[in-house]
Amino acid sequence: AYHSLIILFMVFILVTSEAIPFPAIALLALVLQVLLGVAPADVIASSFMNDAVLFVMGSLMFAIAIVHQGLDIRLAKIIISIFGKSKRLFLAGLMVVSAVLSSFLGEHTIIAIMLPIGLAIIKNVDSSTPDGKNAILLVLFSIAYGTIIGSIGTPSGGARNVIMINYLQEFTDTERIDYWGWIQYAYPILIIQLVVAYFVLQFAFPTSLDNVQVQGYKRSIAKSNSATNIRHLFSCLIIGLIITSWFLFNQELGLGIIALCGVLIFMICGMVPWEVINKNTNWGVILLFAATISLGFQINETGASSWLVERFNELTSSFPEDSSFSWSFMAILTGLTSNFFTSSATTSLLGPMAIELQPNDISFGMSAAIASGFSFLTVVSSPTAMILYSTGLVSIKIFFRVGLLMFSSSILILYLVSKFYWVTL
């Protein structure tokens, strides 16, 4: 068991320091599990590839296929037609649409589609004035926070959600949470977070929005041809089919296989070539997810997670048994760790410990997975944060300053919902 904890500590140091490439970290974690006698090679190999890993691979490929269709213009027209009556309503619409789509298709997909819309409407804003700078930040953060918040909403919103579902199925005797069950737990948190985020951003970036060109952008995208319309329509049908299948067949087929079916449809219909998918798929990330999931399984199987929980309980023995200290510690720990270590890897490695704290209470595992999606503090915490920072318009200091308030609010929202709403499910 202690060998698995040594590997866990080593992986954490290597990922946070980026001392070696991610694929090398993944392979090293796999090899060391065998060399240090954590488990036989066949056992390690079987835990390396499961539905959670297939989902990570399938969702990344599916995202590439969707972005390749150029749906950003089509989506912009829909948003403007619904929310275009005022600029602040439009920003609220950007956030809501980003969140809803991100909850089903993943934040890495939606930030790639939505960010060009935001950049287009702020291209003429003068960033040298405080009002103009705040307008730029308000638009960009509205999209970014929408995609980050939305990723907790459904199992397909993020790999960490699927990982936790697998862990709950493997390590507990509770009834398995399906696609709709996860939505019942997570979507109320998502909705409250959106409302809080809107007012947090309005407070953090006060601006008149004078130079934000919503109507000008509407005129620039007014023209489109019928061939593009047909392609977009067919793409939407494929997306709808996959989302419906996640709802109806997630237990029979698995989320990963369904995601891969979507990729196959796009390729078979000639809508995206394999070369594009192969070139843009981050295979190193897939390997790292697989390795950390495998390590997470072994941490539980070897009893390492039970040992950690026993040590934790000894440290907190002075607290009342019915206190929420354990829950708060686990939620804050996973939330903070994910801001430096990626949410999926955090859930893979700390998820077994969260479940072990209360094996018969899924709120501990669910809270850990959801809290790991609160990627508000650092620009390396999520694909959305990294893409936002890469624009050169958002500084690390600003991201942290606004994110600290949003992170604290999100932990409080999660606690209140789990305390008063989850108990009714």
Give, region by region, the residue ranges found by the protein language model:
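Transmembrane alpha-helix interface/packing and boundary motifs in multi-pass membrane proteins
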Residues: I13-I20, V97-G106, Y145-P155, S245-N250, ...
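Membrane-core helix-loop-helix motifs of multi-pass transport proteins
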Residues: V125-P206, F364, I387-S418
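Alpha-helical transmembrane segments of multi-pass membrane proteins
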Residues: V56, K87-V100, S128-G150, I177-Y185, ...
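Alpha-helical transmembrane segments
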Residues: D51-M61, S103-I113, W182-Y198, S363-G373
